[in-house]
C-alpha cells in the first residue's frame, strides 16, 4: 500500500454535498472533486479502461466527478488505482457530511448482456467490503488494466469513505462485462444510499 502524504481541501458544507481531495506521494499525484448531483465527468488516470469505469461511477452514481491522476505506471497500475480509490473515498466522505436526511441503504442489480452483478451499500460509518466475485478464468487484463485491481480499488474506497459495500457477481462469461457491471452496480447502489429522504439521521444511535 502507498505511503500516505495527503493534503485535503476544506469541506464545502453539507448543503453543497461536495468533496475535494488532493493527494501526493512519491508514487502518485491524485486530485478528486465530486458533487452528489448529476453532472459531467472529467477523468484522466493514464489507464483508459479505468477511466471508462470511473465514468460509469459518475454516470450511474448520479454525481459530477473530476479525477486527475499521474502515477508510476511504468512500475505497475496498482498505486494509481488504489490511490484514486483513496481520494474518491475521502471526497465522498466529505460530501456525505453527517448523513442526516440520507437514505443510508442502497441496492442495485445490474445486467450487462450475459453478466449479472448485485451491489449493496450501507453508509454505516464502519468500513467493510465483501467482494464475492469469481471472475471468468483465463484473461486477466483488459486494455492494460489488471482486473484484480477492481477489488483493491473498492477496498480503498470503502476504507476512506467509511462505508459498507457488498458485491456479488452472480454470473458472467465476458470479463469486460463483469467488471463494468461491478462498477455500474456499485454506483447505482451508492446513488440510492445517498438519496435524500427528509432530514432525520438514519440511525437510532444518533450518529453514523
Swiss-Prot record:
What SUPFAM superfamilies has UniProt attached to this entry? Ribosomal protein S5 domain 2-like
Q: Does the keyword Membrane apply?
A: no
Quote one Gene Ontology molecular function term. imidazoleglycerol-phosphate dehydratase activity
Q: Per its UniProt record, what Pfam families does this chain match?
A: IGPD (PF00475)
Compartments in which it is found: Cytoplasm
* Entries under InterPro entries matching the protein: IGPD_sf, ImidazoleglycerolP_deHydtase, ImidazoleglycerP_deHydtase_CS, Ribosomal_Su5_D2-typ_SF
EC number annotated for this UniProt entry:
4.2.1.19
Q: Where are the transmembrane segments?
A: none
Catalytic EC class: lyase
Keywords noted in UniProt: Amino-acid biosynthesis, Cytoplasm, Histidine biosynthesis, Lyase
One Gene Ontology cellular component:
cytoplasm
Listed GO biological process terms = L-histidine biosynthetic process
Q: Which reaction does it catalyse?
A: D-erythro-1-(imidazol-4-yl)glycerol 3-phosphate = 3-(imidazol-4-yl)-2-oxopropyl phosphate + H2O
> What's the main place this protein lives?
cytoplasm
Q: Which PROSITE patterns match?
A: IGP_DEHYDRATASE_2 (PS00955)
Q: Which domain of life is it from?
A: Bacteria
Tell me its family: Belongs to the imidazoleglycerol-phosphate dehydratase family.
Protein name, UniProt field: Imidazoleglycerol-phosphate dehydratase
The organism's taxonomic lineage, starting at the top: Bacteria, Pseudomonadati, Myxococcota, Myxococcia, Myxococcales
Amino acid at each position: 500500500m502507498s505511503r500516505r502524504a495527503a493534503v485535503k481541501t476544506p469541506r464545502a458544507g453539507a448543503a453543497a454535498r461536495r468533496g475535494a481531495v488532493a493527494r501526493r506521494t512519491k508514487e502518485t499525484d491524485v486530485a478528486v472533486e465530486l458533487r452528489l448531483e448529476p453532472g459531467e465527468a472529467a477523468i484522466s488516470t493514464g489507464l483508459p479502461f479505468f477511466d471508462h469505469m470511473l465514468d460509469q461511477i459518475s454516470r450511474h452514481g448520479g454525481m459530477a466527478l473530476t479525477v486527475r491522476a499521474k502515477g508510476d505506471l511504468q512500475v505497475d497500475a496498482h498505486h494509481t488505482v488504489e490511490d484514486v480509490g483513496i481520494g474518491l473515498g475521502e471526497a465522498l466522505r466529505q460530501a456525505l457530511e453527517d448523513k442526516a436526511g440520507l437514505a443510508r441503504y442502497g441496492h442495485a442489480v445490474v445486467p450487462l448482456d450475459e453478466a449479472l452483478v448485485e451491489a449493496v451499500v450501507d453508509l454505516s460509518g464502519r468500513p467493510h467490503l465483501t467482494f464475492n466475485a469469481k471472475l471468468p478464468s483465463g484473461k486477466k487484463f483488459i486494455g492494460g488494466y489488471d482486473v484484480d485491481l477492481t477489488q483493491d480499488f473498492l477496498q480503498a474506497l470503502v476504507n476512506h469513505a467509511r462505508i459498507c459495500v457488498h458485491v456479488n457477481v452472480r454470473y458472467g462469461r465476458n470479463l469486460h462485462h463483469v467488471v463494468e457491471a461491478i462498477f455500474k452496480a456499485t454506483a447505482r447502489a451508492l446513488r440510492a444510499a445517498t438519496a435524500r429522504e427528509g432530514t432525520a439521521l438514519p440511525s437510532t444511535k444518533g450518529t453514523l
